[in-house]
């Protein structure tokens, strides 16, 4: 089973994450940041990943440390659960619309962290959530999962829709990239022989 449990404790946050990459999309989320929980639910449901997140952070200051550290810990959990990447498809992509909004996410489980984030947010906040924290989440994820991630919001007016389509497309791109190809069982998807 491709599963992992990761705990991260700092002076700012305490994060516990459990994932099952071969799940059914179940999510138990208690990050302390309600909008982040809503977005993590999109990853679980659209990625068909079982995800449990429990976090305590210094949200009395702001949500930055919690959102970033959840991204870091989730990235660590993915790296652990994927292992040597043998048999996975490696690449994944998805376009997701929501009313007037369209976003595209492309992921490569290359072992090389990289983030291209092109989301021209139409406002600074969605409720209490600072939209700039979404890039901090994804930066934390890519640096610790060892993936290359391209995120583009192609059009959109509603900032909530912009963020939500990004997270839904991310979940679907993960699902594609992590699918095990039976024709490549046990084979690392690289001409180098390792990732």
UniProtKB/Swiss-Prot annotation:
One of the record's GO molecular function terms = imidazoleglycerol-phosphate dehydratase activity
Q: What highest taxon heads this organism's lineage?
A: Bacteria
What reaction(s) does this enzyme catalyze?
D-erythro-1-(imidazol-4-yl)glycerol 3-phosphate = 3-(imidazol-4-yl)-2-oxopropyl phosphate + H2O
PROSITE patterns named among the record's database cross-references: IGP_DEHYDRATASE_1, IGP_DEHYDRATASE_2
Q: Name the residues that span the membrane.
A: none
Q: Name one GO biological process term.
A: L-histidine biosynthetic process
The main location class comes to cytoplasm
Alphabetical GO CC annotations of the entry are:
cytoplasm
**EC annotation?**
4.2.1.19
Which top EC class applies here?
A: lyase
Query: Which pathway, per its entry?
Result: Amino-acid biosynthesis; L-histidine biosynthesis; L-histidine from 5-phospho-alpha-D-ribose 1-diphosphate: step 6/9
In terms of Pfam families, this protein maps to: IGPD
Q: Where in the cell is it found?
A: Cytoplasm
- Is rRNA-binding tagged as a keyword? no
Q: Which UniProt keywords apply?
A: Amino-acid biosynthesis, Cytoplasm, Histidine biosynthesis, Lyase
Listed NCBIfam families: PRK00951.1-1, PRK00951.1-5, PRK00951.2-1, PRK00951.2-4
Describe the family membership recorded for this protein in Swiss-Prot or TrEMBL: Belongs to the imidazoleglycerol-phosphate dehydratase family.
Q: Kindly provide the name given to this protein in its UniProt entry.
A: Imidazoleglycerol-phosphate dehydratase
Q: What is the source species? A: Polynucleobacter asymbioticus (strain DSM 18221 / CIP 109841 / QLW-P1DMWA-1)
The taxonomy runs: Bacteria, Pseudomonadati, Pseudomonadota, Betaproteobacteria, Burkholderiales
Q: Which gene encodes it?
A: hisB
